[in-house]
């Protein structure tokens, strides 16, 4: 429990809430008449307002990307290894904004928020949101903060998709786009994994059609299974083998179906239990659908190069060798399209055994490459 924070930490941070009363039209055809976005900032906005960086989170992420909320916090924000003084996203140089997206469950308006029309939680009645919807809401937050142009928009996984969408929806408001461990659209296999996770939630008897909050219950089993399936895809076979192998929890097998016998079983159950106690099931459904629906080239006759024709940003694309959820081949597909569109793009493939989750881990070569790129950004 840190009472004196590390020298490269942003230290104590306080979340802020932005309220928007102007309706937000959504891709699904519905609109949100009003909504809140919770966010944090790190560093100082310069006089020219030219040093702002937007952090876009992945499926289970949120606004708390760096620092601590109190001196008693056991863990810092989810990307603390990359944000802070002297880190790749250097807060002595950049003013960093990190938010929880619409539909989230960490303070921004989402399924667990109260629907003003009913006085009850939105639940399953919360509209389906897309990556494009998120970017539109983020643009309104930028307007509120007086930020006309982002020095960089950065994200990993689903966050990388948002960074890419920024260069399409608001091509003149982004100078650098960093898409890390991401893809221009999901593969059929990825959509299949998301569907298995959704079915685990939807078929949990405690889901109650999404109205579980009104009944004072949560679909714990469904959320647990969804997280277990998802977590397997975030790791690599090599990393799981190195960490767990075929290690047993006890000295012998029990020859039954209920005991936790292998160490990897124990790990997955722990991950599922922990996740089911902090995440909203309806939000999980929304996030996986946003992933599935992301396919910006569909609006350009499936021509990915044409998709980025109007982009003015410089691009940095990063992938990890053992990431099979968002493989290096998907990043190279994106890079090829950007080159065909004659965009300024660099590509980094990091040799790392940790799989998809490598983008969250302080791997020295990754941090060095990330920092080198950010150091090149002029303000």
From Swiss-Prot:
Residues 51-360 form the AB hydrolase-1 domain. GO terms for cellular component: cytoplasm. It comes from Pseudomonas syringae pv. syringae (strain B728a). The keyword tRNA-binding does not apply. It is found in: Cytoplasm. The lineage of its organism: Bacteria, Pseudomonadati, Pseudomonadota, Gammaproteobacteria, Pseudomonadales. One of its GO terms (biological process) is methionine biosynthetic process. Substrate binds at residues 227, 357. Belongs to the AB hydrolase superfamily. MetX family. Homodimer. Pathway: Amino-acid biosynthesis; L-methionine biosynthesis via de novo pathway; O-succinyl-L-homoserine from L-homoserine: step 1/1. Pfam families: Abhydrolase_1 (PF00561). The active site is at 157 (nucleophile), 323, 356. It is an enzyme of class 2 (transferase). Transfers a succinyl group from succinyl-CoA to L-homoserine, forming succinyl-L-homoserine. This is Homoserine O-succinyltransferase. Keywords: Acyltransferase, Amino-acid biosynthesis, Cytoplasm, Methionine biosynthesis, Transferase. It comes from the Bacteria. Its EC number is 2.3.1.46. Requires MetW for activity. SUPFAM superfamilies: alpha/beta-Hydrolases.
